[in-house]
């Protein structure tokens, strides 16, 4: 009996420690991934911080890191354009055994191909393009049975293209362009391959039959024999004469001049027609449903030309021309190329440019403001971006990054899927998802914006571009203001298009130059915003000339029809009449014609918070 009890005791003890060890192993996986990432970070040069906070969760706060749906393992690492330099520390990334996607392109990484990456058996896509890796590639890829994308373009790899690529039977995309591969191309029988680029190497021989379907352009810039498209034969004038097709040299010269004249004439006509069409398009630009940012942004070739500018200012900033400049704390990791290829949805057009919703490679969604008519120098633009980017307040939408090149000026913000205050106030109708805003939500919008503006004013700055389309809701459910400081970068707003009229409708009467905004003029614009929120009326309404909310509200009040001012949605709310009147009085005081008679934002915040408490 004693022996039986001992057996049961040890068996239970075995189960306890065994299950504890198993539990420790399972829960330790994410900790192991975390340590692998930290070992990678601590052993590689990274002039720009990756913002991997050791005290915060890996899966939700570390830029570039993606975990599985349960948050137990790291499955993707996206660090393109993250300013990583040097050799990848061995035994770091390769410890992420559940990794499926690895993107380290557009950095300054060097050394041989990281052989330990072949240990990543779950890998589906790897992108190491646009770095400085060198040497030959491994020959055996038997462990990469799940790989679909292999992108090694623009490095310094050499040697022959491995015949082992033929074992990557799931491969869909293979890019080895702009390296120094030599020798003949192996016969890669990969029926699932859809994209291939072997251009600009030192390859010789002919194109294998299995790869001819990709066309000659996929193999250009090599020493290959193109059997299906031989180069045109060069026929001398003597041979032409022998065949009875001799034309004298003066005649040829005359024909050439005539042809050139016709060509130049046609080109001139085409340019003029395109210019006229472009001018008309800019005046009545339609709202596209979806487009690529690449259609509007410069190519890498165009951006690279900026480095050749002789301007001293350009030379000083040469190292930053093709970069996305991030601010501290930005939970993003991408470069200009990511923006060029990002899927983009047009959100709206304002007087300072157009806004897009962009989906990045790692599925993160951002809002990109493409600025237009920037008149300041690059130095002044960057200075203003630094000022705006360093405004830190929960009620001011943070500027996450910006791009400053000769061709483009871009600002990157977090994308708000709920939409702006303008959209939520004036959405088309209920069947399109528009839900009328209740009293509490409108009040919290105004409290948040007031606090954000108050903070901006304490920095001796003015916002200058307050309107409902620039107001969003933060994570705490209060208003948040975006796009501060833009008027300083452009010419005065005087145009009569709809976007300009909306800005001018919010403008204080004393402001004759939109670049000369003040805290007092911000308060006037905020007063318009409050009246818009209380009345539910769009300042542009259905009429081209819109309405003057201040005049309309004062007119209604003077006729003692104050109750007619408020949006019906607010009137239906019980027990808020006194609060509505108090907020209306605050709005009208903010829109006083004399700046000195307007309350400051401290007083505005106090009044709004008092209304909320009551």
UniProtKB/Swiss-Prot annotation:
Modification Phosphothreonine, positions: 441, 514, 591
Entries under SUPFAM superfamilies matching the protein: L domain-like, Protein kinase-like (PK-like)
Tree of life domain: Eukaryota
Positions contributing to ATP binding: 347-355, 369
Segments on the Extracellular face: 22-251
Topology within the bilayer: Single-pass type I membrane protein
Molecular function GO labels: ATP binding; protein kinase activity
PROSITE patterns: PROTEIN_KINASE_ATP, PROTEIN_KINASE_DOM
Keyword Secreted: no
Sorted UniProt keywords: ATP-binding, Cell membrane, Glycoprotein, Leucine-rich repeat, Membrane, Nucleotide-binding, Phosphoprotein, Receptor, Repeat, Signal, Transmembrane, Transmembrane helix
LRR repeat locations: 71-95, 96-120, 121-146, 148-167, 168-190, 191-214, 578-601
Topological domains annotated Cytoplasmic: 273-614
One Pfam family recorded for the sequence: LRR_1
Localization per record: Cell membrane
Signal sequence annotation: 1-21
GO cellular-component term (any): plasma membrane
Sugar attachment sites: 53, 146, 158, 167, 197, 202
Major localization listed first in the record, in broad terms: membrane
Domain Protein kinase positions: 341-611
Transmembrane regions: 252-272
Modified residues (Phosphoserine): 343, 420
Domain notes: The protein kinase domain is predicted to be catalytically inactive.
Family: Belongs to the protein kinase superfamily. Ser/Thr protein kinase family.
PANTHER family according to UniProt: OS05G0588300 PROTEIN (PTHR48010), PROTEIN KINASE DOMAIN-CONTAINING PROTEIN (PTHR48010:SF14)
Protein name: Inactive leucine-rich repeat receptor-like serine/threonine-protein kinase At5g24100
Upper lineage: Eukaryota, Viridiplantae, Streptophyta, Embryophyta, Tracheophyta
């Amino acid at each position: 009996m004693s022996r039986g009890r001992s057996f049961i005791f040890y068996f239970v003890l075995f189960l306890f420690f065994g299950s504890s060890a198993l539990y420790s192993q399972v829960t330790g996986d994410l900790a192991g991934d975390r340590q692998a990432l930290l070992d990678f970070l601590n052993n590689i040069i990274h002039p720009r911080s990756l913002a991997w906070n050791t005290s915060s969760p890996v899966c939700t706060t570390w830029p570039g890191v993606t975990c599985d749906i349960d948050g137990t393992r790291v499955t993707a690492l996206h660090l393109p354009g993250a300013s990583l330099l040097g050799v990848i520390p061995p035994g770091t990334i390769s410890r992420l055994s559940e990794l499926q996607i690895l993107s380290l392109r557009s950095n300054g990484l060097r050394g041989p191909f990281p052989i330990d990456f072949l240990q990543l058996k779950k890998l589906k896509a790897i992108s190491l393009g646009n770095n400085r890796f060198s040497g030959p590639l491994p020959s055996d890829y038997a462990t990469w049975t799940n790989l679909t994308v292999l992108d090694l373009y623009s490095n310094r790899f050499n040697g022959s293209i491995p015949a082992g690529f033929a074992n990557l039977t799931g491969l869909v995309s293979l890019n080895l362009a702009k390296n120094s591969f030599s020798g003949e191309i192996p016969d890669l029988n990969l029926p699932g391959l859809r994209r291939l680029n072997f251009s600009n190497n030192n390859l010789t021989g002919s194109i294998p039959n299995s790869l001819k379907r990709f066309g000659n352009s996929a193999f250009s810039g090599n020493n290959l024999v193109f059997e299906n498209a031989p180069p045109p034969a060069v026929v001398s004038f003597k041979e032409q004469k022998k065949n009875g097709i001799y034309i004298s040299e003066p005649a040829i010269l005359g024909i050439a001049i005539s042809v050139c004249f016709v060509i130049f004439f046609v080109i001139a006509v085409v340019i003029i027609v395109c210019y006229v069409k472009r001018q008309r398009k800019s005046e009545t630009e339609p709202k596209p449903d979806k487009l690529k940012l690449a259609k509007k942004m410069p190519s890498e070739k165009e951006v690279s030309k900026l480095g050749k500018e002789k301007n001293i200012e350009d030379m000083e900033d040469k190292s930053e021309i093709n970069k996305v400049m991030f601010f501290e704390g930005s939970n993003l990791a991408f470069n200009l190329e990511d923006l060029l290829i990002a899927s983009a949805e047009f959100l709206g057009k304002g007087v300072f440019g157009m806004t897009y919703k962009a989906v990045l490679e790692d599925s993160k969604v951002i809002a990109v403001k493409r600025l237009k008519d920037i008149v300041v120098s690059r130095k002044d633009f960057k200075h203003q971006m630094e000022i705006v980017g360093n405004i830190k307040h929960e009620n001011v939408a943070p500027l996450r990054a910006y791009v400053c090149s000769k061709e483009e000026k871009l600002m990157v913000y977090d994308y708000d899927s709920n939409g702006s205050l303008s959209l939520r106030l004036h959405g088309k109708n209920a069947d399109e998802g528009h839900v009328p805003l209740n009293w509490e939500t409108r009040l919290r919008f105004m409290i948040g914006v007031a606090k954000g503006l108050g903070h901006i004013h304490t920095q001796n700055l003015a916002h200058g571009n307050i309107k409902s389309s620039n107001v969003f809701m933060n994570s705490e459910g209060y208003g948040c203001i975006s796009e501060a400081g833009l008027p300083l970068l452009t010419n005065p707003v005087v145009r009569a298009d709809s976007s300009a009229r909306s800005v001018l409708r919010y403008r204080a009467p004393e402001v004759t130059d939109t670049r000369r905004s003040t805290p007092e003029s911000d308060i006037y614009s905020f007063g318009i915003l409050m009246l818009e929120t209380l009345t539910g009326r769009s300042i542009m309404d259905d009429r081209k000339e819109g309405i003057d909310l201040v005049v309309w509200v004062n007119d209604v009040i003077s006729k003692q029809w104050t109750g007619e001012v408020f949006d019906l949605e607010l009137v239906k709310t019980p027990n808020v009449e006194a609060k509505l009147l108090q907020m209306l009085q605050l709005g009208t005081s903010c829109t006083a014609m004399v700046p000195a008679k307007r309350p400051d934002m401290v007083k505005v915040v106090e009044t709004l918070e008092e209304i909320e408490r009551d």
